[in-house]
Structures are given as C-alpha cells and as structure tokens.
UniProtKB/Swiss-Prot annotation:
Signal peptide: none annotated. GO terms for cellular component: NADH dehydrogenase complex; plasma membrane. The gene is nuoC. Pfam families: Complex1_30kDa, Complex1_49kDa. It catalyses: a quinone + NADH + 5 H(+)(in) = a quinol + NAD(+) + 4 H(+)(out). GO terms for molecular function: NAD binding; NADH dehydrogenase (ubiquinone) activity; NADH:ubiquinone reductase (non-electrogenic) activity; quinone binding. NDH-1 shuttles electrons from NADH, via FMN and iron-sulfur (Fe-S) centers, to quinones in the respiratory chain. The immediate electron acceptor for the enzyme in this species is believed to be ubiquinone. Couples the redox reaction to proton translocation (for every two electrons transferred, four hydrogen ions are translocated across the cytoplasmic membrane), and thus conserves the redox energy in a proton gradient. HAMAP family: NDH1_NuoC, NDH1_NuoCD_1, NDH1_NuoD. InterPro entries: NADH_DH_suC (IPR010218), NADH_DH_suCD (IPR023062), NADH_Q_OxRdtase_suD (IPR001135), NADH_quin_OxRdtase_su_C/D-like (IPR037232), NADH_UbQ_OxRdtase_30kDa_su (IPR001268), NADH_UbQ_OxRdtase_49kDa_CS (IPR014029), NDH1_su_D/H (IPR022885), NiFe-Hase_large (IPR029014). It comes from the Bacteria. NDH-1 is composed of 13 different subunits. Subunits NuoB, CD, E, F, and G constitute the peripheral sector of the complex. Its EC number is 7.1.1.-. In the N-terminal section; belongs to the complex I 30 kDa subunit family. In the C-terminal section; belongs to the complex I 49 kDa subunit family. The lineage of its organism: Bacteria, Pseudomonadati, Pseudomonadota, Gammaproteobacteria, Enterobacterales. This is NADH-quinone oxidoreductase subunit C/D.
C-alpha cells in the first residue's frame, strides 16, 4: 500500500532541511555506518546523501532490495563542481554524479551523490541494476567526461560522433562567438561523411546468422511516423523486428547549458520550448523550483491561475496526441476535429496571456498580469463545448473495431518493466500504478481540487494508453470547472523582495521597491546559494527541474529531466519480436515530441 501522506503539505517547500529524520537515512546508517555518508541540507525536499564511490553499487543494491524498495531510477546526471564557491560541509570534488531514486510504496525519493577528482573520473555503471541508466550514463559521460566502467556502449548520444569536448564542463564555451571560426576542410568533410556510414557493430547489432543476413532499415530521422527528427535503426528478419536502436539528439539545443548564462528570470521562455506543446505546464516546475530557492510563498489566486493554465495546455496536448495516434492507425478525420478544438483553447490562452503556444507567462512569485475581464465567459463556453466533442472522438474512432484490432495487446508491458525503464505518466498508470504527482505530491494547490486519477488494469498496451489519456481529459475539464467556480480573490504576485519583476505600482513610492525593480530587471534576482528540485505531472509524464544556485543571478547548474527521454529508451525492450506496422502504432501511443527528448 502506498502512503500518500508522507509529503507534509504544512511544511514549507522552501525550507532548508537535511532529512536526517527520514527513515531511509537511518536504514543506510544502520547498514553501512554513519561515517559512510555525508548528508547535505538542501531545499530539494528529499534526502541528499553523498556516498563513497567504492560503496555506490552496494548502497544502490541495498535500496533496491529493501522492504518498500526504491524501484525507479528517476534521473542520473553530473555537475562540474570546480567553480562552485558555496560547498560548506561537502566532500571535496571536482565533479559529482547524482542518482535520483524513487520508492513507489513509500512515495519518497532519495538522491545519492558521488564525488570525483579530475584525475580519476571513473565510477561503476549501474545498468545491471537499472537498465534505464544506459542513456543517462552515456549523456553524463558525453557532457562531463565521467567514465562508467562496465557500461555496454559508452558512446555519444546527443552530439555527433565526431564532436570534441564535454559541453557542460565550466571551461567549455557557452556561445558560438567563443569558438574559433568554423572551417570545413576536405579532410574534415571526409571524416564527417565516413562517420555517417552505417556499421551494425557500432550499434550493438549483428549482421546476420550463419544461414542468412539480416536486413537493416532506417526509420527516420524524417519519417512522418517518427514524430520529429528521430531515427530508429531496425534489424529485420522479413517484417519481424529482431532488434532496434533509437538514435536521438537531432533536436538537441543545449538547454541546460543555456541555463548557466541566462538570469533566473530570463530563462523562463526557454522552459516553454523544452516540450513545445506543453506551454505553461513546462514553466511550472522551473518557477516552483526557483521559488523554493527564494523562499517565496505565492498567493492562492496565483496557484489557481497556474493550475488553470496548466490544465488548458494539458487538454491541448492530449487532443493532439489522441488525433495523431488515430491518424497513425489510419484515420484522418479526427485530426481536423482536434485542430478545431485546439483553436478554441489557443484563443482562450491568448486572451489570458497574450500568446498562444509559448506564453512565457509564469513569473518568479506570480504571473505576468492578472486575468482579463471576460475570461470566465470564454472558459465557460469551452467547458460547455468540449465534453460532447470528446464523446465524438471515442464513438467515431476509438471504439472502432479495426483500431482496436491494431492496438489492443500491441507493445504491452507490465508495472515492473515500466518502473525499470523510468516510465511515468499514462504509460505507468496503465499498468495499474496510479502515480500522478498532482495527487501523490500536490503542488500549486492541486490538493484543493476534486479529481480522479485514471488507472489501467495491469497491462499497458497501445490501446489502454490512449484511453487513459481520454479519461485524463475529462478530469482536466473537472479541474477547470472548479477553477472557474472557485477562483480566489487577491494579488497576482507575491509580496516578496525576490518576486521578479516586483509590483510596478510601488516603484515610484518606495525606494526599496524601486531598487529591487532596477536590479532585477537589469541584472536579475540574486538567489541564495542552495539546491532545489521540483517535479510536476506534465503532459507526457513527470517533468522536473533540479537547480543549483551559487548565490548569483544565474543558475550554477540546471538539470532538466523529461519523460520522453526515458520513454524512447524503452522502445527496444518492448518492440522486439513485433512487426514494423506494430512499431508505428507503438510510437503513436507513447506521446512524445523530440524537443522533450533532446532538450
């Protein structure tokens, strides 16, 4: 039985805590001794424990085999610690690697950290304990240079094979003008062309058996069913998929590196573009994490407005997913229906925020401006329209026997497999685990809303995943109706020195406010040195921001964990033995965009 009461809503999220009273810290100390760990006090809301490198595998194994085990590796990445000035009480480190684990039964997390010296960047792989560590370790090596001993294929994943250097190191340039001018010599051109030559062995695949050769097929990176710049290399025996390797990174824009050279405030527009369909949903975890650093508690009106915008974008994203999923199976009409409905949402979003897809409207401490006059009428008209329209999608397409025959039982996995691969969102809930952050770990006032979490019957297949999204749409409509009926009165910004920008109306009356306004608009707010973390239930699964402040106007390290990255890594384990046509349906059922994968 999962304990949903372990996250104390009365405890301020911005309070710095060491979590020494968390049971898992006591369990670790009892097993390995108190001297084996350094517990770091942060504003992440979870225990952060530094572990000795030689004990890493033992500690991770212990946590995974405990009663109420830590069964999901939620995230794994690194940090360049060399320029960090506020490291009081922490182990000496030039670099560090963190492992974020989740226990579903406890509804609790723990973050393990390992300190590394620049002259010894080796540590053991955890891929035998958590298979989804594969891509995370590859990316961490690529971005920082840590070598994970025993990794099955430690190669570049985001950057081209010929790329030189580790981009997230502090001594790696962040701007194109800091590089030497690019010159494409004949030698370099030949090298680049050679790197594009397909060699199955480099991808971990066999050319054939003793009796026959396999056929290899490139699906993407410009195939309509790959849903973006995404390539899958298929190893085929006839129509059967013997093996496949997803190839990502074509949409990589260095979003985490950008976080190190933008102010806390000016980075908000970038969050919209991590997953470009989610809009304000993607602003939420970043803004909440910054507010934890700042110690800001926002008014109830701000919380409810943020929930309302998030649910509008959730419906908007789900409509596109459902309609393109149906299109992948072979029906065209629902796509045109969906774009008509999505237009109504965009009109409403534009009336409130002034923008459509990428509003960049949430602010540190509030929102950009108050709700406009007449917003209630627009929202009521949409709520009156959408329920019957949703029934039309179900009756006209999703109950179609041909669609059911193409999707039921296809690309199926159970709860254990979902947790091993870090699956979240509807894919996980279809297996029977109702992990929805809005319910399990409420944020922005979600605890005040009455809604249900749709859950499947134990197996997540292509049909159950899309039907769960339909039910989630209905629940989002319930939440919007409550926002309409119960919108609190009050300010749209918190009265706090780090609210950015501060309330404009007081700048000409109070010198303190004028100074804050001038500094925060010109340089950006200065956040206290600390670490914070926030996860939210985004449109495609759990999205999170892990921020490190060194007491400046910019983030020292911005780590963005997106759901689509984990979901694409799972593809080979699910689709082996299926047909190419099944893969097309499976891709349509995942609900991903490549900006969310590649960041």
């Amino acid at each position: 039985m999962t304990d949903l009461t372990t996250h104390d809503l009365a405890q301020p999220g911005w309070q710095t805590r060491d979590h020494l009273n968390d049971p898992v810290v006591g369990e670790l100390c009892n097993r390995f001794g108190p001297d084996a760990f350094t517990v770091q006090a942060t504003r992440t809301g979870i225990p952060v424990v530094w572990v000795k490198r030689e004990q890493l595998l033992d500690v991770v194994t212990f946590l995974k085999k405990q009663p109420k085990p830590y069964v999901m590796l939620f995230d794994l990445h690194g940090m360049d610690e060399r320029l960090r000035t506020h490291r009081e009480g922490l182990p000496a480190a030039d670099y560090s690697v963190f492992y974020h684990l989740i226990s579903i039964e406890r509804n609790r997390d723990i973050m393990l950290k390992v300190a590394l010296a620049e002259n010894d960047m080796h540590l053991p792989t955890v891929t035998k304990l958590f298979p989804n560590a594969n891509w995370y370790e590859r990316e961490t090596w690529e971005m920082f240079g840590m070598a994970f001993d025993g990794h099955p294929n430690l190669t570049r994943i985001m950057m081209p094979k010929t790329w030189e250097g580790h981009p997230l190191r502090k001594d790696y340039p962040a701007r194109a003008t800091e590089f030497d001018p690019f010159e494409l010599t004949k030698q370099k051109e030949d090298l680049e062309m050679e790197s594009l030559t397909f060699k199955p062995e480099e991808w971990g695949m066999k050319r054939g058996t003793e009796n026959e050769d396999f056929m290899f097929l490139n699906l993407g990176p410009n195939h309509p069913s790959s849903h973006g710049a995404f390539r899958i290399i298929l190893q085929l025996d006839g129509e059967e998929i013997v093996d496949c390797v997803p190839d990502v990174g074509y949409h990589h824009r260095g979003a985490e590196k950008m976080g190190e050279r933008q102010s806390w405030h000016s980075y908000i527009p970038y969050t919209d573009r991590i997953e470009y369909l989610g809009g304000c949903v993607n602003e939420m975890p970043y803004v909440l994490a910054v507010e934890k650093l700042a110690g800001i508690e926002v008014p109830d009106r701000v919380k409810t407005i943020r929930v309302m915008l998030s649910e509008l974008f959730r419906i908007n994203s789900h409509l596109l997913y459902i309609s393109t999923y149906i299109q992948d199976v072979g029906a065209m009409t629902p796509v045109f229906f969906a774009f008509t409905d999505r237009q109504k949402i965009y009109d409403l979003v534009e009336a409130i925020t002034g923008f459509r897809m990428h509003p960049a409207w949430f602010r540190i401490g509030g929102v950009a401006h108050d709700l406009p006059r007449g917003w209630e009428r627009l929202l009521r008209e949409f709520l009156d329209w959408m329920p019957a329209r949703l029934d039309t999608y179900v009756k006209s397409a999703l109950q179609n026997t041909i669609l059911k025959g193409r999707t039921q039982g296809v690309a199926a996995y159970n709860a254990k497999e979902a947790l091993e691969w870090g699956v979240t969102g509807a894919g996980l809930r279809a297996t029977g685990i109702g992990f929805d952050v809005r319910k399990w770990r409420p944020y922005s006032g979600y605890e005040n809303f009455d809604f249900e979490v749709p859950v499947g019957d134990g197996i997540s297949d292509c049909y159950s995943r899309v039907m769960l999204k339909v039910e989630e749409l209905r629940q989002s409509l319930r939440i919007l109706d409550q926002c309409l009926k119960n919108m609190p009165e009050g300010p749209f910004k918190a009265d706090h020195p780090l609210t950015t920008p501060p309330p404009k109306e007081r700048t000409l009356q109070h010198i303190d406010t004028l100074i804050n306004h001038f500094l925060q608009v010109s340089w950006g707010p200065v956040m206290p040195a600390n670490e914070s973390f926030q996860m939210v239930e985004a449109t495609k699964g759990i999205n999170s921001y892990y921020l490190t402040s060194d007491g400046g106007t910019m983030s020292y390290r911005t780590r963005i964990r997106t759901p689509s990255y984990a979901h694409l890594q799972q593809i080979p384990s699910v689709i082996r033995g299926c047909l190419v046509s099944d893969l097309i349906v499976y891709l349509g059922s995942i609900d991903f965009v490549m900006s969310d994968v590649d960041r």
